Amino acid sequence: MLKTAIIGASGYTGAELALMVFKHPHLSLSGLYVSENSLDKGKAISELHGSLKGIVDEALQPLVNVNQAAKECDVILLATAHEVSHNLAATFLENGCVVFDLSGAFRVKKEGFYSEFYGFEHQYEAWLDKAVYGLAEWNAEAIAKAQLVAVPGCYPTASQLALKPLVKSELLDKNQWPVINATSGVTGAGRKASLTSSFCEVSLQPYGVFNHRHQPEIAAHLGCDVIFTPHLGNFKRGILATITTKLAKGVTEKEIQEAFETAYTQTPAVRLLENEMPKIQSVEKTPFCDIGWKVQGEHLIVVSAIDNLLKGASSQAMQCINIRFGFPVLTALI
């Protein structure tokens, strides 16, 4: 059994991870940690997340001694804020742990990126260079050898899974950037109380227009520029991305179909829809990404749907664990 600790276990993603680790036949839960100043320290995780009652009732421990915690673990899941992950990861890695970071701290290898989009200077360039981007369907070979996996963001997951088959097969017009409009539920903002994510205050609205940190993440790993506009929706969980593209000259519907089927026929977490478009209801509380598309003339619209807390975070992290240690890819997920 691989001893597994979750850092930042009090949040929505941490709770999902705790349940997955509990269900996994080859993982054991060695610790649920929160920060020293967390108001939740000492509480049972099931006190915060009632669905875990009688299943995972362990107490949330303050992370006081990082080196000691590292010595007691094989696998670390960082469900922490970006700068917290940045500061913690190296200690776990230097103690030989395999780290799966759900923050953005190690996703993009571009000079100046972290100071511009995350507000801090990256201090661990060597680990940033070694980090493997954990888009499970597209990077399995590298994930299987990695010590540090940077689990993608929720919007980048939905966007890249929809676009990568088209970009790889060179089916898109390179002179016109794909336009991504994506809407997320309020759990994407985390568990901490905020007026902007309060149910009575949320109204469908774009945010981060032209400057959201996920735009350069998508572009960096997709290999082409995009226009990305996120929206906040008044529902709990899920992401729906609607992507408008222009096809390269002469591309046929058959080529598009073949590109998606070649990419995803053997990937159980991606479901290709025929004659229908994805909807959040079908992926909510599942590890799946549903993809549908329609062609009209030289334009193609692709739609993808995921659960932002699962395929957009915790279940993708678990997919990466399964790939890294040679377990079936959906172990503990269905």
From Swiss-Prot:
The active site is at C154. Pathway: Amino-acid biosynthesis; L-arginine biosynthesis; N(2)-acetyl-L-ornithine from L-glutamate: step 3/4. It catalyses: N-acetyl-L-glutamate 5-semialdehyde + phosphate + NADP(+) = N-acetyl-L-glutamyl 5-phosphate + NADPH + H(+). It is found in: Cytoplasm. Its EC number is 1.2.1.38. One of its GO terms (cellular component) is cytoplasm. GO terms for molecular function: N-acetyl-gamma-glutamyl-phosphate reductase activity; NAD binding; NADP+ binding. Gene3D superfamilies: Dihydrodipicolinate Reductase, domain 2, NAD(P)-binding Rossmann-like Domain. It holds the Pfam family Semialdhyde_dh. It is an enzyme of class 1 (oxidoreductase). Keywords: Amino-acid biosynthesis, Arginine biosynthesis, Cytoplasm, NADP, Oxidoreductase. GO terms for biological process: L-arginine biosynthetic process. Disulfide bonds: none annotated. Belongs to the NAGSA dehydrogenase family. Type 1 subfamily. Catalyzes the NADPH-dependent reduction of N-acetyl-5-glutamyl phosphate to yield N-acetyl-L-glutamate 5-semialdehyde. This is N-acetyl-gamma-glutamyl-phosphate reductase. The lineage of its organism: Bacteria, Pseudomonadati, Pseudomonadota, Gammaproteobacteria, Vibrionales.
